[in-house]
């Protein structure tokens, strides 16, 4: 039976992310705003980091026009969960890149205004 031997430190580890020492600041220079948001539904709602906040579940109560073109200002790949009846203040950040939105709840389906 062959035995697998791993060197003390391979030069490449798949999926590894190497960063410089210190803090990493996210979304520097982008427009942000805070909104009070409440889950008016009877089930928990989880919203991911890159979901167009304007288009989240209709049970979420907040000023949708203020959220147009924005997403949660949280790390990529993470989410925020709202329990039924829960209210909290969230920070949103403007969507970047080409600002073209497709899918979600199909309220935009193209270039943001």
Curated annotation (Swiss-Prot):
Disulfide bonds: none annotated. GO terms for cellular component: urease complex. Transmembrane segments: none annotated. Gene3D superfamilies: Urease, beta subunit (2.10.150.10). Pathway: Nitrogen metabolism; urea degradation; CO(2) and NH(3) from urea (urease route): step 1/1. It is found in: Cytoplasm. Keywords: Cytoplasm, Hydrolase. GO terms for biological process: urea catabolic process. Its EC number is 3.5.1.5. One of its GO terms (molecular function) is urease activity. Its main location: cytoplasm. It catalyses: urea + 2 H2O + H(+) = hydrogencarbonate + 2 NH4(+). Signal peptide: none annotated. Belongs to the urease beta subunit family. Heterotrimer of UreA (gamma), UreB (beta) and UreC (alpha) subunits. Three heterotrimers associate to form the active enzyme. PANTHER family: UREASE (PTHR33569:SF1). This is Urease subunit beta. It comes from Nitrosospira multiformis (strain ATCC 25196 / NCIMB 11849 / C 71).
């Amino acid at each position: 039976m062959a035995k697998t031997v791993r060197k003390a430190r391979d030069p490449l580890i798949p999926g590894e992310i190497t960063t410089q020492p210190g803090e990493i600041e996210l979304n520097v220079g982008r427009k942000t705003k805070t909104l009070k948001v409440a889950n008016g539904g009877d089930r928990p709602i989880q919203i991911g980091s890159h979901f167009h906040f304007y288009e989240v579940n209709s049970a979420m109560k907040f000023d949708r026009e203020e959220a147009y073109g924005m997403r949660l200002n949280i790390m990529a790949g993470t989410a925020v969960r709202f329990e039924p009846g829960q209210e909290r203040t969230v920070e949103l950040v403007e969507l970047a890149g080409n600002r073209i939105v497709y899918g979600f709840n199909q309220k935009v389906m193209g270039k943001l205004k």
